[in-house]
Amino acid sequence: MGDTTSSEDVPENKQKSLKFEIIDARMKIFKDIVKSKSSESVKEEQIYQKSLEFFDEDLKSSEESVSNEEIKTGSEKELEPLNVFDIILIMLQQLPERKKPIGSLLSKWILMNFMNWMQDKQSIMEQQMTEYYQKKAGLACVKEPKNEEYLLQIFKISKEFVIDLRKSKVQEYLENQKFKEAAEIVMKHEVVDDYSFEQITLPLILCDKVQIVDELLKISKKLQKSYISFLDQFVAETDETVNAFFEPYKEKGMVTINLSRFHGKSLTIFMQKFFNGQVKQFKFDLEERRDAPKFVANMKRKALKYFVGKRFEDHEMNDELFCEHMKSTLPECTDKTIVQFLILLWDTCIYERRIEALFWATYSNIDRNSKYMPPDLKEELENPTTEMKNGLEKLQALRTTKNCQEEDEQLYVFEEQKKYPIRIVQNEQDLEILLSELGELEEGMYIGYDSEFKPYHLIDVSTSRLAIIQLFFKDKAWLINCVAIDNLASRDDVWIRLYKGLFESNKFSIVGFDIRQDIEAMFTVPSINKNFKIENIQNVICVKSLAENVNALSMDILNLSTKTSKLSVLADHLVGLKMDKSEQCGNWQCRPLRRNQIIYAVMDAVAVFEVFQKIVEVVRKHELDAEKLLVESHMITVKKEKVRRDCKNISLIPWNEFYQIIHTHRNPEKPLQKPSELKIVVDTMVLGLGKNLRLLGFDVYIPRDVTELKEFLRKMDKMEESEQRLVISVPSRSYEMLKSDNPNAKFVLIPNIYEKVPIDLVCSFFDFFNIDISPDQDYIKLNC
């Protein structure tokens, strides 16, 4: 017959079980004490008395264990005698609430009590202290350094001994690919910089331990730079190059993450979010230009391509705007990026664009012997044909003049009527005048507010986005030249005074259209971000929200056809103001500003002011509670109270209304994608989103069930690159299984789906992929 003795019957296990039963009972007593409502001093005294009681019990048990050693027989002789040092170490491991402040305090009390108790018990030290327990105490210090001060004294071990154990333990974890455990030790002991990015951080990235990576980055500037350099090396690289880097790690079984995030557009989006997210939030010591040169070059290359498309293909950008963008962007580019831009123009073989290539090659003074320069373009630069030479000279002559404001010239919002003079603020003296006029405003007045931003590809994460701020009040428009202010030696003081003058006044309110993004841009100014909090602003009203709140009561009040409208639509409909949008793609960082730019910019502040006044007038005419609507339209209210749309099927929304909503979910300063350019397969948890995307012209594969989805993904793994589809899923256990089974598939996760109605899900999708749709595209299947 086989041995039927259970593990619980083994004497060694019986001893261990009894030991832990005793300690468990003690922990319950300690927990009751720390959870009681007694004062801290009372708790400390109770812990002290109980600790001494327990230590005496352990001593008595250990002495009895030793004295009984001679009469033990058989397997009993193999048992270790009870040891007070063993018990105290086990108690530390089992303490209640040990990860909370009260747990730390409890461990401190118990260790101090043990030290006091041991003072007159030298014989116990000689009898029961062994190298085994000293090493065990050293490992306890490695695991929890906050107890180190007391354990070093109790167990008579040195700091160097603990350091050696720590290094050995970390190395053991690394060799066994327990990178999370290794990271926890180096963070607790504040020795993160003793280990390279490749030793701990990179393996954690590859096994998708994002939270631990974030904690490491918060601690170490060195790792921050290593991390962004790691990402930057893959920008604009081929799939083969990227895959080759990770192959050795895959062979070691270290890769569980979806590597698609390190390829192409997924990588640049990820890096953008990193710079705008963690870098800003935790104030990492990182700057795009300094620490991610390939990322910056790629952004500029994309921007140049975008401007060429807008100028020569879409015909939405005039020559003045195009030149401004080129003159701001090209000096910031490397020779390689400039030549790529020239080739983009030259290789079209279109005369007009080839002249442009010659013009910008001459303007940028590019080295004609650059290894990137194509031979035919180099030849044309050195020996231009008569036709090309004449075309170049004509273009150069055309671009020698610029329509700028003359010095001391008074500009008006409406030039013909000389209505609403424009005042420029660009130094401390100008600011004094503005603040003085703000101070003279009467109680309850309103100020129209708008701002324009610098091109995204020309700023760093630490750079203010603001290019200009426009104000309108008392029939006068103000344009604040933020670029000029940033160049003042006293810029910090100027910004703080301006902020206080605008946003800390109880006399007036500021009105803007979709104004939160303007205020968030204001908080990219370092001195403002450092000294103020956006949630403390109380005097800002969102006119877009006000119009939507009125429409929610009845569409007949403002007599609008859609619940959500652009400012230009509201201005035209409510006050008969037709807004010129020819400068919409302008470069607001370029100086000096042109006359048309200045007038265009301040027009938005005038428009939002007049639209606001008209809405309030109409609301009061209908005898509605205007004050309640204004409170509900405050910027902070908009942030906190998300408007829910209860439409379950977007096909029920009129197309013109749907377009007005979805069209705002894109960034025209970045490359746009058309629905037809994306191939998608949806997880079974987002089938509704898939159906709605199909209505909008996306190429969507919608599986009937999980089985069909898994089968499709298996087949897709063998398809050509051109036939691959993005897999749209949600963070879940099902996604983890799909990702594990299909490591080559590219997944995109849509978070918080259960908190969003269908149209919000579509908006999230458009935000992520920067989708552009036209109001008259014929593939749309929604109601018209």
UniProtKB/Swiss-Prot annotation:
SMART domains from the UniProt entry: 35EXOc
Entry annotated with the keyword rRNA processing: no
Entry-linked Pfam families: DNA_pol_A_exo1
Domain of life where this protein originates: Eukaryota
Gene3D superfamilies documented for this protein: Ribonuclease H-like superfamily/Ribonuclease H
Keyword line: Exonuclease, Hydrolase, Nuclease
Gene Ontology terms for molecular function: 3'-5' exonuclease activity; nucleic acid binding
GO biological process, one term: nucleobase-containing compound metabolic process
UniProt domain 3'-5' exonuclease: residue ranges: 422-619
One GO term describing the cellular component: cytoplasm
Protein name: Uncharacterized protein ZK1098.3
Protein source organism: Caenorhabditis elegans
